[in-house]
Amino acid sequence: MLKWALIFLVVGLVLGALGFGGIGGAFVGLAKILFFIAIALFIVFALLALFAGKKISDSI
């Protein structure tokens, strides 16, 4: 899960640079939407990794 969280963080940062930096031109709106989706998925997967890892370590 943490792997996916880091992937979505990188995707979000790249899309943010393209969308908010104005490099994307016609794709600015799409890049901004995908940026927020990627950041939301990063948060979800980071929390899942945190809580799942804690439950696994507690059961050992």
UniProtKB/Swiss-Prot annotation:
Family annotation (InterPro entries): DUF1328
Keywords: Cell membrane, Membrane, Transmembrane, Transmembrane helix
Membrane association type: Multi-pass membrane protein
Pfam families noted in UniProt: DUF1328
This protein's GO CC annotations: plasma membrane
Top-level division of the source organism's lineage: Bacteria
TM region(s), chain numbering: 4-24, 33-53
Subcellular location: Cell membrane
HAMAP family: UPF0391
Family statement: Belongs to the UPF0391 family.
Name of this protein: UPF0391 membrane protein Swit_2334
Organism in which the protein naturally occurs: Rhizorhabdus wittichii (strain DSM 6014 / CCUG 31198 / JCM 15750 / NBRC 105917 / EY 4224 / RW1)
Organism lineage: Bacteria, Pseudomonadati, Pseudomonadota, Alphaproteobacteria, Sphingomonadales
